[in-house]
Amino acid sequence: MILVNGQPVESLDVRDRGLAYGDGVFRTLRAQAGEPLWWRDHIAKLAADCAALLLDAPDETGLLAEVRRVAAAGQGVVKIILTRGLGARGY
């Protein structure tokens, strides 16, 4: 599942700065029984990473709801990737 600004999409634009330049952050979470493990630790690290890159951190409540929805199948891994989005070429 791919969400862009909270909306599901089929693919990402190749001009996304996260894809082109690695301009973003990510967290990989383990889910068990439909719940992300160590959520508080992951969301704290995600917020700190966003602050370091001057990215807006996602709404925690909304993000947790999406993670739970994806993890509802039971056990697995959820990867959260936040990018700066579309932007001009260059660093």
Could you describe each region identified by the protein language model?
Residues M1-Y91:
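Conserved alpha/beta cores of soluble small-molecule-handling proteins
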